[in-house]
Structure formats: C-alpha cells, structure tokens
Amino acid sequence: MITTKRLRLELSTLIGAAIALAGTSAVIGADEAAARALARQSNCFKCHSVDKKKDGPAWREVAAKYRDKPDAEATLTNHITSGEKVKFEDGHEEDHAIVKSKDPKEIRNLVDWILSLP
C-alpha cells in the first residue's frame, strides 16, 4: 500500500527529473509575474521574501547558495514539492508547504525565477 507521503515523494522525484531533463539554464527566461503569482497562491511569502529573512531564508540567499550547483533545480524542486521537514532557528521542525501546482512548467518557472535572483 502506498502512503500519501510516499506518493508525494515519488511525484516530486518525477517532477524534478522532468525539469532536469528539460535542460535549459535556470537563469534564462523565467516569467517573474507567473512565479510571483504561484508563490502568492502557495503562501510562500508567509515564510519567505525576495530580500529579507523571515521564518525562511530570503530567496536571494537561496539563489546565492544553490545557483552554481549542478543539482540546484532538482534540489529546490524537491524542496517545494515533497513536504520535507525544515528546521527553524528556534529548533522546531515543520513540514515545508507544498507548492500549489502539479504543472512541471509552473514549478520549474518558480525555481528558475528564484535561482535567477541576483
């Protein structure tokens, strides 16, 4: 029997693989308006902002940390689609919210936009 958590993990792995196989650079062609709309719809701005640390890191910090890593897109895609645990500064852990889209193109655009931030 497949559990919901296992199904989420398998789905996020498939989405990550599809995005990785698409093969274009993360910094080319991100649609900022669409990325921001998906982030807003998914309540990402509750914990993140572009420039300032909130409960989660600023996306510019995320971009700087992952931008030059070969697995950056797959890593971030997995992070926003799998519901993995995240640890907060006060030590408590929560499941990371899952982006509210199953469309690999929308998810990739959000990841590409984050990675494109200077």
Regions found by a protein language model. Name each.
Residues I2-I15:
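Bacterial N-terminal signal peptides that target proteins for export
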Residues S42-V50, L110:
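The canonical Cys-X-X-Cys-His
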Residues L21-A39, K65-K69:
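Electrostatic cytochrome c docking/interface patches
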Residues H48, T81, L115-P118:
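Protein kinase-like catalytic domain
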Residues D55-Y66, H79-N109:
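Axial heme c-ligation environment in periplasmic c-type cytochrome domains
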Residues D31, A35, D55, A72, ...:
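Stable alpha-helical elements in mature extracytoplasmic
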